[in-house]
């Protein structure tokens, strides 16, 4: 088991050795708390975009379903007639220059897997740059936009924001509620009290402190041909190889089991780079992966490789709340 996997297991399931990391946790807390206090005090250079900006992020390490929710937010805003763009750090991306506008024809090595997925799925203008303020400026110089979504960046305080949405895995919660490296938190748990909304991925109902949303499998897509098949393409009990290089691979494997398939799980590191050899398994079975992994595997995919597309399904209460926020932020663009 890789060190990162061991840490995740310890953070969410407990391990006595984590006590040894508490001095480092105290140092980390001081650094991140001081960073936020300087932001609140207006110290340092902070870029204020001329259009509303919404941050969609985490306070935990590991997958929370952020990319599917961003896709939902983009498509929802587009349905309302809003011109929306996205900025992202572009984790793992190696573009020729920064900032870089992602094209649907880019490869994942250039654009990053998540930004490429977002552009290919909904055609939204998207700029990557670790300096998100610079990414926003470049995006606005290229496109007349009403609204910008920041893919992650909750802790990127040099970029002012109008709304903060934080995602939490409902099953794992905040783990041991400790900050890095003794726990999975990027910021102390109290930070949740200052965000605008918390969304719990996998929650059945809304909670007093947040909204529920879940990921709904929608269709199987063949990596080579692009052919779309209903989920019934695989009969109940079908054995298949399951590949997931995401923050929480087990969630993907569990989803396949809820569809009554029998996945042989192959978990990879988040943002893993693949090759045909790395994905050659025995026995020979159909292979199903996440959409995020698929953008990196199309060039060498076999005929029986598929990805499972999933759609975020936020609660009606969140949709109503979000529409109210959009009305507040963009009163001239959205008439009541």
From Swiss-Prot:
Keywords from UniProt, A to Z, are:
ATP-binding, Kinase, Lipid A biosynthesis, Lipid biosynthesis, Lipid metabolism, Nucleotide-binding, Transferase
The record's section on NCBIfam families has: lpxK
Q: What is this protein called?
A: Tetraacyldisaccharide 4'-kinase
Taxonomic superkingdom? Bacteria
Species source reads Pseudomonas fluorescens (strain ATCC BAA-477 / NRRL B-23932 / Pf-5)
Name a GO molecular-function annotation: tetraacyldisaccharide 4'-kinase activity
Q: Which residues form the signal peptide?
A: none
- Enzyme Commission number(s): 2.7.1.130
Name the family the entry cites: Belongs to the LpxK family.
Q: A Pfam family for this UniProt protein?
A: LpxK
Q: Which residues bind ATP?
A: 60-67
What is the role of this chain? Answer: Transfers the gamma-phosphate of ATP to the 4'-position of a tetraacyldisaccharide 1-phosphate intermediate (termed DS-1-P) to form tetraacyldisaccharide 1,4'-bis-phosphate (lipid IVA).
Q: Please, one GO biological process term?
A: lipopolysaccharide core region biosynthetic process
GO CC annotation: plasma membrane
Question: Catalysed reaction per UniProt?
Answer: a lipid A disaccharide + ATP = a lipid IVA + ADP + H(+)
Known pathway: Glycolipid biosynthesis; lipid IV(A) biosynthesis; lipid IV(A) from (3R)-3-hydroxytetradecanoyl-[acyl-carrier-protein] and UDP-N-acetyl-alpha-D-glucosamine: step 6/6
């Amino acid at each position: 088991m890789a060190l990162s996997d061991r840490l995740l297991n310890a953070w969410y399931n407990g391990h006595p050795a984590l006590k040894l990391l508490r001095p480092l946790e105290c140092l980390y807390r001081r650094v991140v708390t001081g960073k936020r206090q300087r932001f609140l005090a207006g110290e340092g250079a902070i870029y204020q975009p001329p259009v509303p900006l919404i941050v969609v992020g985490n306070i935990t390490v590991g997958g929370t379903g952020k990319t599917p929710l961003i896709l939902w937010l983009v498509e929802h805003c587009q349905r309302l007639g809003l011109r929306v763009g996205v900025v992202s750090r572009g984790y793992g991306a190696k573009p020729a220059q920064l900032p870089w506008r992602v094209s649907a024809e880019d490869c994942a090595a250039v654009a990053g897997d998540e930004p490429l997925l977002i552009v290919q799925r909904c055609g939204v203008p998207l700029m990557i740059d670790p300096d998100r303020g610079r990414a926003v400026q470049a995006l606005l110089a290229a496109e007349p936009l009403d609204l910008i979504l920041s893919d992650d960046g909750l802790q990127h305080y040099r970029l002012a924001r109008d709304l903060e949405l934080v995602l939490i895995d409902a099953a794992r919660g905040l783990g041991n509620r400790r900050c890095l490296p003794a726990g999975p938190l990027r910021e102390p748990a109290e930070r949740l009290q200052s965000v605008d909304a918390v969304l719990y991925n996998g929650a059945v109902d809304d909670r007093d402190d947040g909204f529920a949303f879940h990921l709904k499998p929608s269709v199987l897509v063949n990596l080579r041909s692009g052919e779309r098949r209903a989920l019934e393409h695989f009969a109940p009990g079908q054995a298949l190889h399951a590949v997931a290089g995401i923050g929480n691979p087990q969630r993907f494997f569990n989803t396949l089991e809820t569809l009554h398939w029998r996945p042989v799980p192959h978990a990879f590191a988040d943002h893993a780079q693949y090759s045909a050899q790395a994905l050659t398994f025995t026995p020979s079975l159909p292979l199903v992966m996440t959409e995020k992994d698929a953008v990196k595997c199309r060039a060498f995919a076999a005929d029986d490789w598929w990805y499972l597309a999933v759609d975020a399904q936020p609660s009606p209460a969140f949709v109503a709340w979000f529409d109210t926020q959009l009305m507040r932020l963009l009163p001239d663009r959205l008439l009541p």
